[in-house]
């Protein structure tokens, strides 16, 4: 492990310290390492051809005109990416779905965009993790 010195603005250092405390880091180095890993993983998952895993979560209105069938159709068109799907009834009108995906990150992003763009889908979020060799 290498020791490095960095210079931060006072406001940025204050934000780092606050983040470190909220997340329970023992020191700034641990926080900075995690932030850097997260940034590198995000960049890696945005490159077409990168293999990885992802979690797609979204809320949708199940009574919205043909929305459930459109989502299922989209899932079937991308069946090769799907590892598992969890379906939760939030209330009478809304459902939460969480899909675990695996494959080319470009294809995963395309699938997520197709689902999230459907009218009636809300709170769509894709969390990607590059596959580590």
Swiss-Prot record:
Write out the GO cellular component annotations. Answer: protein-DNA complex; transcription regulator complex
Entry annotated with the keyword Transmembrane: no
Cofactor requirement: Ni(2+)
One GO molecular function term?
core promoter sequence-specific DNA binding
Which is a Pfam family this sequence falls into? NikR_C
- The entry's Ni(2+)-binding residues are 76, 87, 89, 95
Does the UniProt entry include the keyword DNA-binding? yes
Q: How is the cofactor bound?
A: Binds 1 nickel ion per subunit.
Known partners and oligomeric status: Homotetramer.
Xref: HAMAP family: NikR
Q: What does this protein do?
A: Transcriptional repressor of the nikABCDE operon. Is active in the presence of excessive concentrations of intracellular nickel.
Q: Which PANTHER family match?
A: NICKEL-RESPONSIVE REGULATOR
The protein here is known as Nickel-responsive regulator
Q: Which organism is it from?
A: Escherichia coli (strain K12)
The record lists the lineage as:
Bacteria, Pseudomonadati, Pseudomonadota, Gammaproteobacteria, Enterobacterales
